[in-house]
Amino acid sequence: EVEIDLRAWTLEEVQRVEEGLKALKPVLPGARLVLSGGLNRPPMEPTEASLALFAKARAIGEALGLRLEPGRVGGGSDGNFTAALGVPTLDGLGLFGGDAHQKTEYVVVPEIPRRTALLAELLAAL
């Protein structure tokens, strides 16, 4: 048994890999190939609307002394679903810290007020 965790930057790439997997045929006598499952989350592809929203967040961040850079991490969030629906979506606006989803995960407490202000001011600007 093999489990595949497929992550891709575009839906087109997901479809290309899925087609390749579906085309596979067993080569060993008596072997069988059964594919199950499917796309868990669509890729969060950048859109003009999301990039415009990021520009607004970046400007607000600069005024607060925060340096925001666009990034892609290849993970998954609920934002993947809203982005796939065409809703302008930003991810990563939460607290600053590290070691996400691990026992050693932490938040930099002195940064909480600025991160909170960033989100509040962005919402007020919408």
In which residue ranges do the predicted regions lie?
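Metal-dependent amide/peptide-bond hydrolase catalytic core
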Residues: 1-126
